[in-house]
Every structure is written in structure tokens, then in C-alpha cells.
Amino acid sequence: MKLLEQIEKWATETPDQTAFVWRDAKITYKQLKDDSDALAHWISSEYPDDSSPIMVYGHMQPDMIISFLGCVKAGHAYIPVDLSIPADRVLRIAESSGAKLLLSAAELTVTDLPVRTVSQNNLKDIFFTHKGKIPNPEHAVKDDENFYIIYTSGSTGNPKGVQITHNCLVSFTKWAIQDFNLQTGQVFLNQAPFSFDLSVMDIYPSLVTGGTLWAIDKDMIARPKDLFASLKQSNIQVWTSTPSFAEMCLMETSFSESMLPNMKTFLFCGEVLPNEVAKKLMERFPKATIMNTYGPTEATVAVTSIPVTQEVIDTYQSLPVGYCKSDCRLLIMKEDGTIASDGEKGEIVIVGPSVSVGYLGSPELTEKSFTMIDGERAYKTGDAGYMENGLLFYNGRLDFQIKLHGYRMELEEIEHHLRACSYVEGAVIVPIKKGEKYDYLLAVVVPGEHSFEKEFKLTSAIKKELNERLPNYMIPRKFMYQSSIPMTPNGKVDRKKLLSEVTA
């Protein structure tokens, strides 16, 4: 499969079919082709002998999708950067990626970036002035060339750029279309920001099958009235989100088959799917199939899936995350480096063509997490799990990396930035669970010198600093102040003791 060719055929076969909808803005497959062609032609003329990645900044604007395809047609991987990402983090991505160009689909609020920036208006001008120009198809990203690079949390305080090739994405997309029984021309929910790789689960299966992406932005999510008004008119048939987002929607009693009468498939990834959420969805949408999936960004979105039936719910207290896609395989590795038997816990290792080629510009980090097994790329996930007759069960993180509301983050990165704040002498992040999954982050802080009379004022000052360094979803919800942090005899932070103290 050549991904771009599959997407472009809809511009010929169904040119007026809507490819993407966001609020009052929409684009057809013909517009998507014409504008991405124009942009690719401009990029190739400006950067003729260059294949450095291109940053694409914005939120849910149609120009984001156009820019992604324009970059790839010109032979450049794209780096999606959501406008919610703090300026400091955007700067670090720009510096570490080697990008020379940033395309802005929204107003750019970050200044002093070491890259050339194309404003929202200038982007529109490029679409207009280069209209009708066809890029050289030989320039397009192909095979093992990078298609996109998504930055995830890094333990040193610096984000890591996960490189996903054309072949990685083709492997995922072909499997998703077949395994999830996706049909031509369906309407897909697009809820995850493009800088979160869950969005790939809807973008490319939709575009390859001539579907329509229906985007829900963060402002809608913050205003349930707007959210459900949009869902009502969407006619969504394929739902892609974290379980947390579906759980939030289930709090609205009208969120059911009556609101979305043609709902066919729920696709969940990014965090644990609780049994209760699956049960409620089955009650509200009796005709829909619920798919539970698993996979890290480093293995292209997801590599396992299972339909969650009543039998599965009745059989398992914690839902399994599924069977591996046919072109990949899973190994459960014990601490001694041997492969675990059925039912034995260990680290989940993913082997096959879905696996990333590594972290951009970080050979040491790549060597630590990626390897070759029997001539194929393999990724050591750091996730704990076990297999039973080919079925994978996920048991959380082996290290201090967690998933909170679908976002993966390393607690050490948050601690790194928290300790760098004024008024903070020492700090540890404690993730607090509610049932099976993480509910919020608690910051246990040893304060430095300060003149605040009340703890809440100190907390506000620390949060203000953190907001300049970290995305909102990585900011701890609660703060607790102590005179010291408990330590183990080895001189390490005693996290178990700390957790027992704060949850007692």
C-alpha cells in the first residue's frame, strides 16, 4: 500500500466528499489534494535538497491535516505540535529535532524559535499562489523514511522524538482497517490532539477509506453543552478516544444510541479500559462493537486488539488488551532475559514492522529501548504484562512512567521541572489511583524559603512556574508539603512508603 496514493484516489473518485470537519470549517478530498499539492510544491522549491522534519503547529484546524500531507508529499516528516504545549517545550522540540521550518495553522504564541515560521495567513497564501502546481511524486516519503515524529515525555526533562516510518504507518493502517472491520465512507471521531498518537488511529484509517473526520476540540470538551450538540449532528460511526473521554461522555444520560444512531465501532487505546465503562457502553449502544487495544507510540499506535463482549466482561476482572496483529509478535521477558511462560509476568517486548526506528537524534536512548530480534526491530516497552493462549494482559508500568487520562508521562520529568521551581527544595510525584487506573497526580514537596502566609498561595506560585514548562495534563492536581522525603537504606526515594503515607 502506498498511503498517499490511497488517500488521493478519493479526490478523483469522490472529490466532493468531506474529508475533515471542525466546527464550521470543512474540507473535501479535492481541497485536501489541491492544497497539500500546492504546499508540497512550495516546500520542495524552498528546500530542494533537504529532508529535515517540519513542525506543524495548531489544534484541530483543517490546515493541520493539509500541512501533514503537504510535508510528506515533499519528502519531509511532520512533527505535530499542539497549541496547548508550553513555549519552553516547543522550543526544546525545535532545537532537538533539527527542524528548519514551522507551519502554523493557528496563531503562533511562541517567540524566538530557531526555525523559519510560516504564519496562518501566509499558509493560506501558499495554497492560493501555488494552486494547480503538482509536486514531484518521487520526492514523497516512502518505505523506511520517516512519515511523522511524535514527541513524548522524557526522563531527563527533554521530550523524545519517536520516529514513525511510512512502512510502520502502512502496517498499522492496513491492520486497523481489516481488524476493526472499517468500511468505506464512515464518519470517524477525531478527539485526540494531533501531538498525541491516538489521533493516528482515526486520521489514516479514515483518509485511506474515504471517510470523514469529525473533530472535537478542547474548548468543546470543556463545555459539555457544545460537545454534545456537536456529537448530535456528527453521525459518528467509528469512535476513537481514551476510555476516560468515553467515561466523561457517559455521565450525560442522552449519550446513547439515540444521540448516535449509526455508531458501529468503539476503538479504545491509551489507557486501561475499565469493565464498568465497557458495560455501560454495551447498554447504551447495543449494536456497536467495542474494541480494546494496546500499544505504545514507539510501535505505531496499537499492536493488539480484542472485541469486548459480554463473555469477555464476565470472564475477566481486568479486561485483556487483545491478540497481536499478524505481522508482529509479542514476547514477555523476565528480569533474567529469558522468555516467560504462559501466565508468567514480565516486560512486554514488541517485535515487527510496527516498531519505530528509534528516537530522533538520541542514539543512547534508542539503544536502551530498541534492539533487533531475529532480524526484526524490537521495542522494550517498559510495560509489565503476561500472556495466556496468545491473549495479552497489561499490568502497568515497570518504571515510573504512567498513563493519566490517556497521556503518557514520566514522573521523573515532572519531578525534574518541579525541583527547578522557585520555592522548591525537594519533590516527588505520587500518582493516585481510583480503582484500576490513575486519577490524578499528587506533588509531595519540601518547600524552600518563601514568604507566603498560606499554603494555597505557595501552590499557586509553583503551579504558575510549572505551566511555563509543562503541558497542562502534567501539572499535579494536589500538593502536599513535608519537611523531608522518606528514603530507602540505599539512599533512594522510598516511593512505596510515600504512597502508603499519602493514601493512608
From Swiss-Prot:
Its main location: cytoplasm. ATP binds at residues 152-153, 292-297, 383, 394-397, 492. Its EC number is 6.2.1.54. GO terms for cellular component: cytoplasm. It is found in: Cytoplasm. The keyword Ligase applies. InterPro entries: AA_adenyl_dom, AMP-bd_C, AMP-bd_C_sf, AMP-binding_CS, AMP-dep_synth/lig_dom, ANL_N_sf, DltA, DltA-like. Keywords: ATP-binding, Cytoplasm, Ligase, Nucleotide-binding. Pfam families: AMP-binding (PF00501), AMP-binding_C (PF13193). Pathway: Cell wall biogenesis; lipoteichoic acid biosynthesis. Catalyzes the first step in the D-alanylation of lipoteichoic acid (LTA), the activation of D-alanine and its transfer onto the D-alanyl carrier protein (Dcp) DltC. In an ATP-dependent two-step reaction, forms a high energy D-alanyl-AMP intermediate, followed by transfer of the D-alanyl residue as a thiol ester to the phosphopantheinyl prosthetic group of the Dcp. D-alanylation of LTA plays an important role in modulating the properties of the cell wall in Gram-positive bacteria, influencing the net charge of the cell wall. This is D-alanine--D-alanyl carrier protein ligase. The lineage of its organism: Bacteria, Bacillati, Bacillota, Bacilli, Bacillales.
